[in-house]
């Protein structure tokens, strides 16, 4: 089946290139995109919406119906970029499932997933209930459901039992009026069914919307009347939802895809992914020059070197992103030096003096006030080296963090932490730590296979590096 894709956000042009490469239809392109590239556009409502995340521009949101459309697009994206961290919903949004009720308005769903039952009275513990999943954030074990059957289509969602009509805020008044006529023409009883008009209704005829309402209402009524079965089960998979974190290496692949359709500087997506506007404005300016033939894509490398040099003498933070979605702000650090090299390379040195006591993670050593930390960040490399010294300048230990090649912005630096690390105390052998965390993330699919393999290689490399550099 050919699925139609709608793209939005900072990765939109690259995603158009990917969709064309992988054989998808394109639907509902923005005016900006239509002015930028000449591509065939389908008039169908989209099956898949792909955009950058609301909380992090380093992430891509994949929201799709049917469920398998999202699975396929995610697989195609990961095959292309290679390196990513992926968080998925435990159960598809608006999946219809049978669950066994437990105490406290909870129910055990398929696979032992715990569902919090919202709205109305709590079901009798031990009884079987048929619920629709209304909330299942990617990467979270919190799943919320509502008793009843809600089915998704491309233009509408229909709930039974339910009542009333809701309309997507993305529809114009004209499109909303068309959809309301379709609801009326469907002939369903709005005291028994609720209808939510989706944004995709804008691209459908009144007759198509009406037909989908009737079809979903019949199926929802059938599923509700037959009642729950004897064991937890999925009856309808609902909508696919996942968050794909793109580290710098994946963003470079996206740069290449974008270049195939539109003039693009190196590091385009890394620079655009920062929350401040400054990096994006520099990128836009550089790409004006590319379009006018004044310089090439390497102007993006110059931007990275410029930002890195501007950090010297200032304070900066390191955004230490973990695969599970947690971001730890390390610092603030004082940026003591920057040593540039060709392309995206170079070394940024960060320093800080500790004012409070504590323990150096991984090394198991006491940290005293007055101790000093020196961090070597190697642009384009997979290792970040932390050196720890006492007040007299004696080396206490070294910590090699395994992470994706860092990205630089005016705020500081960011990377995806790969969980495994290597530590070394003076006069001792290097020790690899947290290997189990990496293996768990790889088994669960949180990290892609290629990224897992790279993390293992880099941990081995770090061990040899620490042995030779810090005997």
UniProtKB/Swiss-Prot annotation:
It comes from the Archaea. The keyword Nuclease applies. Keywords: Endonuclease, Hydrolase, Nuclease, RNA-binding, rRNA processing. The keyword RNA-binding applies. One of its GO terms (molecular function) is RNA endonuclease activity, producing 5'-phosphomonoesters. It is an enzyme of class 3 (hydrolase). SUPFAM superfamilies: FomD-like. InterPro entries: DUF402, FomD-like_sf, Ntdp-like, RNA-bd_FAU-1. GO terms for biological process: rRNA processing. Its EC number is 3.1.26.-. Belongs to the FAU-1 family. Probable RNase involved in rRNA stability through maturation and/or degradation of precursor rRNAs. Binds to RNA in loop regions with AU-rich sequences. This is Probable ribonuclease FAU-1. The lineage of its organism: Archaea, Thermoproteota, Thermoprotei, Desulfurococcales, Desulfurococcaceae.
């Amino acid at each position: 089946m050919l699925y139609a894709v709608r793209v939005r956000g900072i990765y939109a042009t690259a995603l158009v290139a990917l969709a064309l490469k992988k054989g998808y239809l394109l639907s509902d392109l923005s005016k900006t995109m239509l002015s930028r590239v000449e591509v065939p556009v389908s008039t169908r409502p989209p099956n898949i919406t792909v955009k950058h995340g609301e909380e992090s521009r380093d992430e891509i949101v994949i929201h799709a119906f049917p469920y398998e459309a999202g699975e396929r697009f995610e697989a195609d994206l990961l095959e292309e970029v290679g390196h990513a961290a992926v968080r998925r919903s435990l159960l598809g949004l608006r999946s219809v499932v049978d669950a066994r009720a437990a105490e406290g308005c909870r129910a055990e769903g398929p696979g032992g997933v715990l569902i919090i039952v919202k709205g109305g009275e709590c079901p009798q513990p031990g009884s079987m209930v048929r619920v629709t999943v209304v909330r299942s954030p990617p990467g979270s074990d919190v799943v919320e459901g509502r008793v009843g059957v809600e089915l998704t289509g491309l233009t509408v969602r229909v709930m039974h039992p339910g009542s009333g009509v809701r309309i997507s805020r993305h529809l114009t008044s004209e499109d909303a009026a068309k959809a309301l006529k379709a609801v009326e023409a469907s002939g369903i009883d709005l005291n028994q069914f609720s209808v939510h008009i989706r944004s995709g209704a804008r691209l459908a005829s009144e007759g198509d919307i009406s037909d989908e309402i009737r079809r979903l209402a019949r199926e929802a009524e059938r599923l509700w009347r037959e009642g729950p079965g004897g064991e937890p089960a999925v009856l309808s998979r609902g909508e696919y939802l996942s968050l794909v974190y793109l580290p710098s290496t994946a963003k470079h692949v996206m740069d290449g895809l974008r270049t195939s359709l539109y003039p693009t500087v190196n590091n385009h997506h890394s620079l655009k992914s920062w929350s401040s506007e400054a990096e994006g404005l520099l990128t836009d300016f550089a790409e004006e020059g590319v379009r006018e033939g004044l310089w090439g894509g390497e102007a993006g490398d110059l931007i990275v070197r410029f930002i890195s040099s501007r950090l010297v003498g200032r304070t900066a933070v390191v955004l230490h992103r973990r695969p599970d979605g947690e971001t730890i702000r390390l610092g603030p650090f004082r940026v003591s030096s920057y040593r540039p090299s060709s392309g995206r390379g170079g070394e940024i040195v960060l320093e800080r003096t500790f004012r409070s006591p504590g323990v150096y993670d991984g090394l198991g050593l006491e940290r005293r006030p007055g101790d000093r930390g020196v961090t070597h960040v190697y642009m384009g490399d997979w290792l970040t080296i932390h050196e720890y010294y006492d007040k007299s300048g004696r080396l206490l230990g070294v910590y090699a963090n395994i992470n994706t090649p860092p990205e630089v912005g005016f705020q500081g630096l960011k990377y995806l932490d790969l969980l495994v690390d290597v530590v070394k105390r003076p006069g001792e052998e290097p020790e690899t730590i947290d290997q189990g965390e990496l293996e768990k993330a790889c088994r669960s699919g949180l990290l892609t296979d290629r990224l897992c393999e790279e993390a293992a290689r880099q941990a081995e490399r770090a061990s040899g590096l620490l042995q030779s550099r810090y005997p």
